[in-house]
Each structure stands twice: as C-alpha cells, then as structure tokens.
Amino acid sequence: MPYAASLSAVGGVAPYTWSLVGGSLPQGIQLQGASGAIGGTTSKPGSYPVSAQVTDASGKVATAGFSLTVIAASPTLAVTSSFLPAADASVPYSASLSATGGVTPYQWSLVSGSLPLGMQLLSSSGTIKGTTSIAGTFPVSLQVTDASGNHASAAFNLTVSSTTTTGFDGPAELPRTYIQSAMSNTPAPGKTITVNAGGDLQSALNNASCGDTIQLQAGATFVGAFTFPAKNCDESNWVIVRTSSDDSLLPAEGTRMTPCYAGVSSLPARPAFACTSTKNVLAKLVMPVTGSGPIVFAAGANYYRLIGLEVTRGTFAGTAYSLAFMRGAADHLVFDRLWLHGLAQDETGRGIALAGTNIAIVDSFFTDFHCISGTGACSDAQAISGGGGNLPMGPYKITNNFLEGSTENIIFGGAAATMTPADIEIRQNHFFKPLTWMKGQAGYVGAANGNPFTVKNLLELKNAQRVLVEGNILDYSWGGFSQSGFAILLTPKNQAGNNGSNLCPACQVTDVTIRYNLIRHVGAGFQIANALSDNGGAQLDGQRYSIHDVVIDDMDGKHYNGASLFAQLSVSAGAPILQNVTIDHVTAFPSTMVLNIGAMLATSGPMKNLVITNNILSVGTYPVWSTGGGPGNCAYYDRPLTTFNACFSPYTFAGNILIGSSASFPASAWPSQNFFSSNANSVQFVNFSGGSGGDYRLQSSSPFRGKGIDGKDAGADMDAINSATAGVE
C-alpha cells in the first residue's frame, strides 16, 4: 500500500534540507530532501532504523533517529466459495460460505435477491441453513465484511429441487403428488397484452391466446366480475394476468406479498410489514355488488397464473361471498403474490373458493374475511375453502401465505359433496386472527352494528384426504360461538340439509399429517371426532392421523374463552370408529384437561390403534375426562387408566412427561412407562416462561433427558419446528 509521512523541524533559518546519515529506508520508499517527505510503496516488510539530518540555510545541522516498521499486508479480502450446493425442498439444508484475506472475524450479509422461505443466512458464520418447501432457482448476492470494514461480494444461484415426499408418516399416507408452481413451470411465450386504466379487461381475457401475458396498469382499478374463460391451454402455454410493474418492484418469487406493495404500510392489530417502500405497484380488481367475484373462472378454465394483484370488494351494503370463485372444473391455476381482502366491518365470506384440480395458492396475503354473528347473511368465513361439489378436487398447494379468516382460516368440507379433495399441501403459512375481533378487547373491531364476527377455529377438515400440514404458525382462536377455541379440527361430517336430508355420506377425513407446526394463543388444541350429522347421517370415514412435533403455546381457556384441553378424541353412536391415530412428541400446557374422551361402547365399540407417546403435557384439573352421556360412555369414570382400557383397544400411552398430576391422580392411575413432574420448573426447560413464548427444550441437567420410548427427549423437536417455520411470520 502507498505510504506517506513527513519530517519536521523548528528553529534555525529556513529553508531546510533533509538527508539520511545512517541506516536505509526500505526499497521503494524515499526521503525528499527539499520537503522532508517520506513516501512510496514497498513490498519489503521489516523494521528499518534510520538517522535523519536537517540542515538550515546557515549550515547548522540537527539529527534524530527513527525506526520505520513495514507490516506485511493482509491478503485482499475475497469470497472463495464458488457455488452453493443444491437443496431439496422439504429437506433440512446447510451450506457454509468461505472467504480469505482481510482481518477476521468476518460478518456475512445478503445484499440482493432473497433466499427461499425457510432458509436464512447466519451472519457470524456465513452458513445458509433451514428447510424450504419452495422449489426454484434463487439468485442472491452475498457480501463478507472484515473487521476493518473492507467488503467483498459474490453472486450465487441457490437451486432448490422439488421433492415428492410420498409414502407414509406413521399411520398417515402423505400426498401422492405435489404441485410444481415455480415461474419456470408456467411458461407464457406468447404476446403481451396491455390493459391501461379504463381499458376493457374482459375483452382482453376473452381475446387472449394460450401463452399470452395480460398486463394490467399498475395503480389502476378494474371494477367488475371478470370471467376467465376456458381456452384449452396446456403446460407449455399458460395465460398470465399480472400487474404491469416490473418484477424488480414486486416481492421476489418465493417471497410473500404484503399490503406494502399496494401503498399500505400497516393494518391495525396485524404483524408489522417492515415495508421498504409503500409505492403502489399492484393493479386492483374490485367486485362492485353482492355476489362472487371479481375473479370468476368459467367451467373448464385452465392454465392461468395471476401475479401482483390486489383483489377486493366495493363498499356496497351486502355480502361478497367469494373474491375468487370457480364455476366448475377449473384446473391448473396459480394464485401468486396477491393481496386479497375484504373491508374492516363488512361481510366477505372467503378469499378463494377452491374447486377443480391442480391449484396452487402461494406467497399471498389474505385479510378481513369475516361473517357477522347473529345478523349476518353468511355464517362462516375463511381465507380459503374447498371440499364441496361433485367434481374431482385436488391436488392443492397452499404455501407461504398470510391467512386471515374469522370462522376458519382454512376449511375443507362443510357442504354437499360426492367427491373428496385429495393430496393437499399446507405449508409455511401464517394463520392469524386479529385479537381486536374479540369483543371486550382494546381496539375491538366488529360489524358496524357492534356485533362480533363469528370465530370457530384456525383449520378444520370435514372432507379431505392425504393432507400434509407442515411448518405453519397458527395464531389466535377463541370460543364463545359454537366451538371452544380449538386450533385444529379433524371432524369428518355428513352435512345436514333440509327436510331430513344428508348431503355428504361420502365425506371423509383420512391420512392427515400435522408436523413441525407452532400453535399459539388458543383456547384449546385438537378436536378429533367422528360425529353424526344433525340429521343422524354418518360420514364415510375418519382415521389415520399422524400428529407430531407440534408446540401449543399460550393455551389459555380463560383468556380465549375456551376449554383449555389438549385434545378431544370421540366417536358418536353410529359413526365410523376412530382409529389409527398417533400423537407423538407434542408439547402443550392445558390447564383443564389433557384428553376429553367419548365413545358409546354399546353402539360404537372402542377406538382402535391409539398411540400417544413422548409428549410433554400438563394434565390440568381434570386430566382425562368424559365427553358426557352417562355410564354408557367408556370414559364415564374419569380415570386415566380405566378410561384408556375401556375406550382404546389396542393403545400405547408411554414415554410422556405429565406435569402437575394431583394426589387424586397418582402415577398408579396412569398407564406405566410415563414420567411425572410436580410442576414445570422441575422438568427443567431451557425457559418455561409460564407456557407462553418459552423455549421448551430440556436442559442438559433435566432428569427427563432421553426418556422417550424412542430414546429421544420427550416433547416437540423445537429445533426442527424453528427450522420449518423460519421466515413464516
């Protein structure tokens, strides 16, 4: 590096002349006699003692000794990694970056592009790690900064390959097929049609050819119920309908849309958006009257992809039933980076009403879907619903969305059907209900007449088959309407119709896997029940459930007006037997009861193949309790071991850590091979935090380390949950 210094003198008669009278400067460094400046560049490290002399105009001299030290230069800072190893979707990933030169320690940062949801860059180590369900190629620029503030960067492509995780998880069959929804999977090689503000969107939709892209002017509003016609397109020629904004102004593929992109910096009582800009870059579609729209897919519509749109309703009095609606057998649709929303106090029944096959909903944001209790025209509201009708349904992909619905955030079933939707992937979504929808809360928001919105649960399956629910965060559910604040319901139902009819004798809920999820702020956990319809009709089936590695945090029946129970397991007389249910490695802290059990043995017989293992559960005041019905209920005596022996055959209940069992329910009242702790502190969690917002891993000193029947710690694998849910909120 260039070097510069200057010698100085005082006294005598100027001007001065400088010279070396002893020693030598390193090669490349020189003393300027007239100025006393020392400068140059050298490649010779070492210590150089010299003696310098100054002579004034009268000939007087003075000398002084110095030592010039030359330090070997650090190598130039550089990123030495040349590529990132490929990743597989839904498989844990870890890759470390490397650099040389500069001064350690290094800090790493992402300077452009984005990693797929579920992946993160650890700044101190330069490690990219996590689990993503999103396949595609993600270009990123990564920068290393050394301790001296020097920077170096390099560009990489992280390729995530799709995986078909088929087979079984415990008793439950996983989806047999998964939708590939990357942009590269939906080519549109045709012409571009631009529709400016005031233009005729319906005409553009009618006239577009397969492979065309329809660009809607960013910032413009298009009012109407727009029909997306059937065109008989194919996998090589999609029709894309999108904002005219450049891709660089939108969230990158695989990154969730937020209202920021419509110029909205925040919404009350929702998580912060962290906007980098509030420029409106979306085109807006508005339904002007009561009904379903503004997006309506005609029967046979196929191969459409929607990108960068705000989809909503007008301010009319009345109900908007579905903002996106399918009239018949639509197929191959992708809803990508959209904001779908109702208005703060209206009735908007649902965002997307699913029907048809091969439909993906990705990276989108759903808000303000609600029905008004007591006086409303609709009874249930959801962000996404499906599972009704007489046409094939599924596969469906619902990943990386913010999902807000008052009654259920997602529901499959609850209507007349002769078919069952199958192969449903629900991953890495944030299910959310604003707490301000709860009457009595500060900032309460209900209907204009003051009535609250109807709230039931976060996820309900009444008609669905081969469902994977993985890596989601589910926030807020409370009771006070027809349910008790449950988070998730697996309740196959033959819905009742008029005049004593039953609408869905073929309805079933089978092969459901719920894993690596975080549930928070709820009144109760799971309701798993095979019950008859109001007209006494039985469903087809309800069985093969695998629930594992789930944390239920802040389960508070008092605050959320719920039952504060972990799980209800029940069968009503005449319904199919509940069987093949595994609940393993779950952590939850109910205050009332662990299990609410019911089966009428005279008509149903015991539930079969129940496996409840390796969980950490507080047992509550009434640990294992009957659902009612008198002595005919197998759980009538309300004693754990007695109830299990009567209600389940065969069953396994072992390896569980049971917290707070009172003297009324000693260890002898439970099956053997379980462990008991008088309180949460003696379990020795890393941080119990009252069962709300804690770290429920076990400390190394915990007496319960490795006590699961599989040799692992009981309770949910929090590291796996944190990895699966990284970036979800």
PLM features: what roles do these ranges have?
Residues L25-S43, L115-S133:
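Strand-loop-strand motifs at the edges of beta-sheets in extracellular beta-sandwich domains
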Residues G536-Q539, R544-D695:
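Predominantly extracellular beta-rich ligand-binding scaffolds that present long acidic/polar faces
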Residues A182-P187, C210-Q217, V223-K284, A298-I307, ...:
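Beta-solenoid repeat scaffold
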Residues W238, N302-R313, A330-L343, T357-I372, ...:
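Right-handed parallel beta-helix
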Residues S236-V239, V281-V296, A317-R327, A344-A355, ...:
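Extracellular beta-strand/beta-solenoid scaffold signature
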Residues S162-N207, A218-A220, I240, S245-L249, ...:
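Right-handed parallel beta-helix/beta-solenoid
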Residues F675-E729:
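C-terminal accessory segments
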Residues V10-A14, G23, T100-G102, G113:
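Short glycine/proline-centered coil/turn motifs in the loop regions
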